[in-house]
Amino acid sequence: MWKEFKKFAMRGNVIDLAVAVVLGAAFTAIVNSLVNDIFMPLLGIIIGGIDFSSLKASILGVDVLYGNFIQQIVSFFLIAIALFLIVKVINRLQREKEVEEAAIPTPTKEEQLLTEIRDLLKDRSL
């Protein structure tokens, strides 16, 4: 049983998934900081410092905290926008890298053979 578990745990997919989960957790902290520390204060300035989370309605002595719900919706959209912008930048960087790699022409078979012949002739003359 231990051997089966070890084989399962050491498969590439499981390790890749574990790395993805750890990186995802770290990335979550970055996105949350971007939203909470940068976007939310800017939004607060734009909307006049209103804090939705404190809004509530009392119905028959029971507080309905609809403000927190609104705050979470705003946070969701800000996180979605932040992720969109981050992915957009990453995709652009990848496209630029692909264009650079495509711009470097790979030598044809003839060019490779000529290069080998040249190198052999150089070695002979030394």
Swiss-Prot record:
The keyword Cell membrane applies. GO terms for cellular component: plasma membrane. InterPro entries: Mechanosensitive_channel_CS, MS_channel, MSC/AndL, MscL_channel. The chain crosses the membrane at residues 8-28, 70-90. PROSITE patterns: MSCL (PS01327). Keywords: Cell membrane, Ion channel, Ion transport, Membrane, Transmembrane, Transmembrane helix, Transport. It holds the Pfam family MscL. It is found in: Cell membrane. GO terms for molecular function: mechanosensitive monoatomic ion channel activity. It is a multi-pass membrane protein. It comes from the Bacteria. Channel that opens in response to stretch forces in the membrane lipid bilayer. May participate in the regulation of osmotic pressure changes within the cell. PANTHER family: LARGE-CONDUCTANCE MECHANOSENSITIVE CHANNEL, MECHANOSENSITIVE CHANNEL MSCL. Homopentamer. Belongs to the MscL family. NCBIfam families: mscL, PRK00567.1-4. This is Large-conductance mechanosensitive channel. The gene is mscL.
